[in-house]
Structure formats: C-alpha cells, structure tokens
C-alpha cells in the first residue's frame, strides 16, 4: 500500500552451488518449460493379424509423457479410402479398448495420445483383416512367364482343432496355368501359421498370353484364399527379374504401400532428402508407380494395376472440387500478388507488393471451357500418407492422408531448414492468428484462412510419359479399351501442366530485370517460356472468396521432358482437349531440344538451366553476373532453384533427363536428340563403372561445373568451348544405375551402339548379382549429412532452422515452434522413437556416420522398368549373355 515500508533481504554471502530445479510451481501450477508431446505406439493387434467377423478386437497402446501425464488415448479405425472412425478412448494405463462386433473388411488402426497440456501424438498405423477362419495366401496376384514357374504361399489365420488339409484348385479361362506342387497341403495345430509353398507353371500356348486363372486354396471350416495368376509372354530373363521385383514391391508385407494403398517414398521411415520422412509420398512416387504398372501391363496384359494407380493418384493427390473452393472466382487478369524470393531463409517473411505489375493468365479460360470446370486438375507434390504430423485433412487432426508442404523460403532452404505446414491452413495449428503463413510473407498486412497447392511438373510429365507407353502396349495387345478412360485423364493433366511453362507472375519472357521495370506479359507470345519450370501453384481463400495461380520462372535441365511434350503434341490418344494445348507442347518440344543443345558441356554433361527471374526477385536484390549468357533472354544459372546442395551436382538429374531424350530419340529418330545423346552417352559411360564379376557399380558422387555456355543463337549456336563438367567421387545409387541402364538401352536400340547395349546389360547384371535383397535392391549409404538433425540456426552462416524472433506456434502434437526451436529435430521430436534412430544418435554423440540400406519406391521402379525395357528392346539377350 502507498506509504508502507518493505524490507528485502538475500543471502548474498552464500558460497555453495545451486543446482538447476527440475520442477517449480507458480500459484500451484507446474512450470516445466516447453511442453513435450507424448509418445504412443500400438501394442495390439499385431500388423497383419486376422480376426473373425463379429468378434471383439482388443486394441491396446503404450503411451507415456516425459514431462507430464497422459490424459487419454483415442483409438480410430479406417477402411482403405475411408476416413477415421472412433472406436474407443482409454484414460488410464493400460490403454486398452474393446472394439466390439467388428464387420468383415480390411482396417487400418491408429492411436492418438493426448497429454495433460493438450499435446497430441498419432501412432504409426497397423493394418488388420477381419474375416472368418480363413486360408491366407501371399501374394494375391502373380505373373508367370510362359515356360516358367512362380510360387505363392499358404497358411491359416488361426490354429485348427485337428490336422487340416488345404487343397488348391484352378479356375478361369487359362488352362495353360497349372499347379505342379502344393496342390494339397497339411496344416496341424502346431504349424498352422508356417507358410507352405504352391508352385504354378505356365505352358507355352501362345494364344494364352495375357490369360488369367484363379487358384483357390480351400479347407473345411476355413474361408478360401485366392491368387490371380496371369500368364506372361516368354521374353528374356530380364522380365523374370522384372516380375520378381514387381512382386516384392506389391507384397503388402514388404511395406512399400500404406494400409490405404498409397505408395510410400521409401519402405524405411528414417530418411531425409526432399521428403523429410520416409512415409510421406510425392507425385514423383506416384509417377513411378504408374510407370511400373504400364510395364506390368506389357508383360502380363493385365491393366488393372495401371488404372488403380491413377485412381489412387486422383483420390489422394489431385485436390477435389471441395478441396479448392472458389476457383470460379479466379481473375486471370490478376493471377496473383507479387512476393519476392530472398537469398536466405532468415530474410523471410517477405513483403508482398501489389505495385509490381503482373501479367495475364492465358490458360484459364480455355481450360475451364474445355473441361467444364474452373478447378485445377493437377497433383500436389507432397502427401503425409500416415498423418505423421497430425494435421489431418484440412486440419481435422485425424484424417489420412494429409496434404502438406515444406520448401517455401528461397534457394538456400534445404530440407534441414524447412517448417512443414498443412496445404489447408485454417490457423488451428502454427500461429494462432496466421497459421504458418506468416513464416513466409507478410500477408499484405493481414492473413486469411486459405489453401495452397504446389505441383512438381517433372512428375506430371512422367505420368504422361508412362501413359503413352501403356497406350502403345495395350494397343498392341488389342486391349486399348481397358485404359481409355485413364488416358483421357492423363491428357487432361498434360493440358494443365502448361501452367509450368511461364514466368511465375506471367511477366515478359526474357530480359526481365527489375520487378517493377520488367513489364507484365499480355499473351502467350510474350510471356511463355516454353520450358518446364520447377513448379506451379494455386490456392485461394478457405471460404472461396478469392483465388490465385502462379508458374515457376526457373527451368532446370533435370525437369525437361521432350518425350511428354512430343506425346501431348502428336498422339491422338493423349491429345489435350483445349484448342491450343497440342500446339503449345509442339512449341515446347522445339524449345527443350534447343535448351539442351545450349546447356551441353564440352565433355557431354548437361549444365543447370536458366531463369526469367534472377534471384527469384527479377534481380532487385542482385543482378545477374556481368556477361551472364542467355537463352532467349533467360539468364544462365549453373545451380537453378536451390543451392543447398547445388541443384545440378547430382548425377541422377543427368540420367533422368537423358532417359527421356533417349525415349524420344527411339520413338521419333529426331536427329537433334541423337546429336545430344551421341555426345552424352560416351561421357556418362566414362564416368561410371559396371562390372558383374566384381560387383563394382558406381556413378559420380558429385558433378562440378565451370565456365558457361555461349549466348544462344538459333541461326548460329556456339560450341560452348568454355563450359565444362568434372565428375568427382563415386556413389552406388541403385536407382540412378537403373535410370542409366534404361537410357543406354533406348539409345542402343535405335543407334545400334553395341558399347551402350553392353554397358546397360552390365549395369543390370551387376544390380541383380550384387545388390538384391528380400525387399528389392539396395546399397549401403553413409549419411554424414545426418549431423544436421541437431544443427542450430546460425546468423553467421545462415544455416540451421530459422524461425523469426517473436514468432510462436504449435504442431498438432503440441511441439512448440519458436526462435528457440531451431533444429530439424526440435520440431520433429518423434524421430527419436524411430527404430533406426540409435544409429543417428550414436553419430551425434561422436561416433561414425550412420549407414543405411534404403528402398526408395522410385529407385525400385526405375530398376524394374530398366529390366523390362531391356527385355522389350533386346528380347533374345539373356542375363550374362
């Protein structure tokens, strides 16, 4: 009170040592620092377990909270393609519920733990089957080449009361398929769950190629199991390799697919590259799945998998009408408000600038007219297949899968510096007033709840490429009608892919310096780059009040696809419906062929690319280097789009792009493509090794670039005498090896090069002899970069996870985000519970860099399709021959 005297005192003479308090309270409330989310994992049922319809399934979880208590554990189940349905809640340990009267079906079960501070964590899903006592078969589908045999296994779902005989009987339209062993199998109460083998042989009746038969395994008192077997043409041993790998990829027990049938980026969960978690997926992964199924259709005549892959893509990655509300409000005269890109993540959020002129969108009207919808038909690039982050579907928290995004802060933002966010941002997570949006821009002064999707154009083009080969194979079999509907969707996707051919803000194409000085484009004639840029994106208000679209400005050589451009320009079965789609792709084809001639080094490797917006801000922050050469006014960039690591140092971008060139050359015989390949192929073989005898299989670990190309001239292209590439180190990347083999195979088949054919065969033989395992193909990888799990932000180097001072937010599991949360691991604490985390922890503690054997979906598919491509183009050549 005023006028009252107070005396304070302290023991300033104390000389002891104070220990840090472990807990303290304020007015009785415990203070523990930033709340740590709980941990949770399902302990019952077991993955793959089978139950009887109508029974009660016991669902249990182990849950704990390091800095508090577990308030509750909620359990959910979903069917493939369905949403999560609550099945019970437990508030005390042991966390167990009884799921009563479960109907027959396939289910995915998860547990969601909530702690005393409201933080949540979602467990990994567990897939179970509910059926009566049944005969279990694996795999459910099998392809057997003529003159060869294949196998499947049989077991029982539960113990019989006495010895039980399982009989296997064939039915269907293909008498050429027969059981040669395992027609009768005996199971006892002791060995009921030990798989026994059935062998199926295919005859040699040419009329039965593509035929199918169903082999039904039955036993008294048990439901039957059935395996569909397709008779494949006899080609070479390489197609046997293809079918073996296809079976491994499609075997649910091997973990390539989620319980909902979504292909994972990798079988393994602890993997950090473009996706920051192995059980995310990408449009790239889906494109490889479609390619895999196209080749499977060629070998077997079965097109079910091809159509199913596209249906899954459309269901999970292409936003539905409800997921992109208000696209009818889009104003093509004002596609988007300008926001500059910055050199470093710590220069964000960037300020939007409505005063910068933007061009008009020339595609919107004709696409809406052609397809009767204002919606964009394109896949988002990244999907959290298991809802690991917990955003759910449009922030409902539990829906799976969940559309997310990561990279948004300029060329120096590596995966280690990303802040994952939901594509549908309703401010439920992140910052309470802006969600995650205020990490990236200032919102023009305010923020609106919104959705935003980013497309990866190279994946879309690969989908078109795969669809073309499916069309060719199915037509040769007289089965084109089986995939007509899917081909129409691929053509539609290719039509929308044209959004990648422009400057980001539809500005003038070429010589575009100064965000204000560079004029807005007014038509295709002055704003179309004609090259596949790194992305395009679209979004809008959650309430549908406004919407926007942008392109990408920067073209990387590794994203170009002349094969897809040629297909969309010329193939009647994949022709876009829009009036100018085919012509646009014809123009792009010519531009891409010129682009590669411009970027080819003296040695043969293809240099980085070019941009219409230097630095992502039209040179406002820093102009292009003096004398920087140009391609139709686009500025040369040796590391386009991202710099950590340099974007064109990976040899895989060489093989990916040149494989498409080789397909295009094989299909058309275009001399322009041949000239580029004639120089690239000898260089690629000179920097790679493949020796089946020793198991040596290497490609360059890193490519370094010096000099620059000559400024492009259509009438007199330069020789690029000053542009050079140096290959250093070696790497055994099995996926890149498969891509290289495929490139050389197409080139050899058209050019007659025996050295290219031999090298391709050596790659394939070495892969199969030395790098196969139970899941597919892999090689040991040392991951020294995993030291960056705990790399803190440094204002000196600009590296490490940057969160602006004063910015705070939370993830669905309660993990707090702030400038103090400045490591990759701090916002992904669940990584410490990964089965392989101990390898990383040992490294962080001073041990050796961890070694992993990864099974990436794209890599397995690249290998599988390389086997089939060689079998198709050199059918009389067998392994080792």
Can you name each region flagged by the protein language model?
Residues 9, 108-114, 199-201, 216-218:
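Extracellular recognition modules
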Residues 1, 31-132:
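Long, low-complexity serine/threonine/glycine- and acidic-rich segments characteristic of extracellular
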Residues 9-29, 122-130, 217-234:
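Terminal edge beta-strands and adjacent linker/stalk segments
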Residues 235-311, 478-491, 553-554, 575, ...:
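N-terminal module-boundary/linker segments of secreted carbohydrate-active enzymes
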Residues 279-319, 455-477, 484, 490-500, ...:
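Conserved beta-strand->loop/alpha-helix structural units within folded catalytic cores of enzymes
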Residues 1-33, 790-846, 851-881:
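Extracellular low-complexity, O-glycosylation-prone Ser/Thr/Pro/Gly-rich "stalks"
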Residues 132-235:
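Short boundary segments that mark the start of a structured unit
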Residues 251, 315-445, 454-458, 484-837, ...:
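Extended ligand-binding clefts on enzyme/binding-domain cores
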């Amino acid at each position: 009170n005023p006028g009252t005297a107070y005396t304070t005192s302290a023991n300033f003479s104390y000389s002891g040592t104070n220990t840090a308090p472990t807990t303290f309270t304020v007015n009785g409330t415990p203070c523990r620092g930033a709340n740590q989310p709980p941990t949770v994992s399902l302990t019952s049922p077991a993955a793959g377990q089978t139950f009887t319809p109508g029974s009660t399934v016991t669902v249990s979880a182990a849950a704990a909270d390091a800095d508090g208590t577990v308030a509750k554990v909620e359990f959910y189940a979903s069917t493939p393609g369905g949403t999560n349905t609550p099945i019970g809640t437990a508030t005390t340990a042991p966390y167990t519920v009884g799921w009563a009267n479960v109907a027959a079906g396939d289910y995915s079960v998860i547990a969601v733990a909530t702690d005393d501070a409201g933080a949540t964590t979602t467990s990994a899903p567990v897939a179970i089957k509910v059926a009566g006592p049944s005969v279990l078969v694996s795999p459910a589908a099998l392809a057997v080449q003529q003159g060869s045999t294949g196998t499947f296994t049989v077991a029982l779902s539960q113990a019989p009361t006495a010895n039980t005989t399982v009989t296997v009987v064939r039915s269907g339209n293909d008498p050429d398929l027969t059981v040669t062993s395992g027609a009768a199998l005996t199971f006892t109460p002791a060995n009921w769950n030990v798989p026994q083998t059935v062998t199926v042989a295919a005859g040699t009746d040419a009329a039965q190629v593509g035929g199918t038969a169903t082999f039904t395994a039955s036993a008294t008192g048990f439901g039957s199991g059935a395996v569909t077997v397709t008779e494949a043409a006899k080609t070479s041993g390489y197609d046997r390799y293809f079918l073996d790998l296809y079976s491994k990829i499609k075997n649910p027990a091997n973990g390539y697919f989620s319980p909902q049938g979504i292909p994972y980026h990798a079988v393994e969960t602890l993997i950090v590259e473009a996706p920051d978690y192995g059980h995310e997926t990408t449009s790239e992964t889906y494109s490889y799945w479609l390619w895999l199924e196209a080749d499977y259709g060629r070998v077997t005549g079965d097109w079910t998998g091809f159509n199913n892959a596209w249906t899954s893509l459309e269901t999970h990655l292409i936003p539905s009408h409800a997921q992109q509300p208000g696209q009818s409000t889009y104003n093509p005269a004002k596609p988007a408000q300008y926001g500059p890109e910055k050199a470093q993540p710590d220069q964000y959020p960037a300020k939007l600038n409505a005063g910068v002129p933007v061009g008009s969108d020339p595609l919107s009207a004709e696409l809406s007219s052609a397809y009767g919808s204002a919606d964009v038909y394109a896949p988002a690039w990244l999907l959290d297949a298991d809802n690991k982050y917990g955003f759910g579907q449009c922030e409902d928290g539990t829906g799976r899968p969940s559309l997310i995004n990561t990279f948004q802060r300029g060329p120096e933002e590596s995966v280690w510096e990303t802040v994952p966010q939901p594509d549908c941002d309703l401010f439920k997570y992140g910052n309470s007033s802006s969600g995650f949006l205020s990490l990236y821009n200032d919102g023009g002064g305010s923020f609106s709840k919104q959705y935003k999707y980013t497309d990866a154009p190279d994946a879309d083009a690969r989908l078109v490429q795969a669809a073309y080969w499916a069309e060719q194979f199915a037509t040769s079999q007289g089965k084109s009608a089986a995939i007509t509907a899917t081909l129409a969707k691929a053509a539609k996707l290719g039509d929308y892919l044209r959004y990648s051919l422009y400057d980001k803000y539809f500005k003038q194409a070429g010589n575009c310096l100064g965000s204000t000085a560079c004029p807005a484009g007014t038509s295709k004639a002055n704003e179309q780059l004609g090259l596949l840029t790194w992305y395009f994106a679209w979004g809008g208000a959650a309430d549908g009040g406004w919407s926007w679209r942008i392109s990408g400005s920067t073209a990387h050589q590794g994203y170009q696809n002349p094969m897809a451009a040629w297909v969309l320009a010329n193939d009647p079965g994949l022709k876009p419906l829009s009036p100018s789609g085919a012509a646009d792709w014809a123009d792009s084809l010519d531009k891409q062929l010129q682009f590669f001639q411009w970027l080819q080094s003296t040695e043969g490797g293809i240099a980085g690319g070019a941009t219409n917006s230097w630095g992502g801000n039209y040179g406002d922050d820093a102009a292009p280097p003096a004398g920087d050469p140009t391609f139709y006014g686009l500025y040369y960039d040796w590391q386009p789009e991202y710099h950590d690591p340099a974007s064109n140092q990976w040899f895989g971008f060489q093989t990916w792009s040149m494989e498409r060139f080789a397909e295009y050359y094989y299909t058309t015989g275009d001399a322009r493509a041949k000239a580029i390949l004639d120089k690239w192929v000898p260089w690629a073989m000179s920097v790679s090794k493949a020796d089946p005898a020793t198991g040596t299989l290497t490609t360059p670990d890193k490519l370094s670039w010096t000099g620059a190309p000559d400024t492009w001239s259509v009438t007199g292209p330069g020789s690029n005498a000053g542009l050079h590439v140096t290959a250093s180190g070696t790497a055994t990347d099995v996926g890149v090896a498969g891509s290289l083999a495929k490139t050389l195979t197409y080139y050899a088949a058209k050019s007659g090069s025996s050295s290219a054919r031999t090298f391709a065969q050596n790659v394939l033989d070495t892969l199969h002899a030395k790098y196969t395992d139970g899941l597919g193909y892999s090689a040991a990888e040392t991951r020294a970069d995993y030291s960056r799990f705990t790399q803190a932000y440094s204002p000196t180097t600009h590296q490490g996870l940057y969160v602006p001072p004063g910015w705070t937010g939370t993830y669905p599991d309660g993990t707090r985000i702030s400038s103090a949360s400045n490591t990759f691991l701090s916002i992904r604490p669940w990584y410490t519970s990964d089965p392989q985390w101990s390898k990383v922890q040992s490294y962080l503690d001073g041990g050796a860099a961890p070694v992993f054997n990864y099974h990436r979906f794209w890599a397995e598919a690249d290998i599988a399709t390389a086997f089939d491509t060689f079998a198709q183009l050199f059918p009389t050549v067998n392994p080792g021959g």
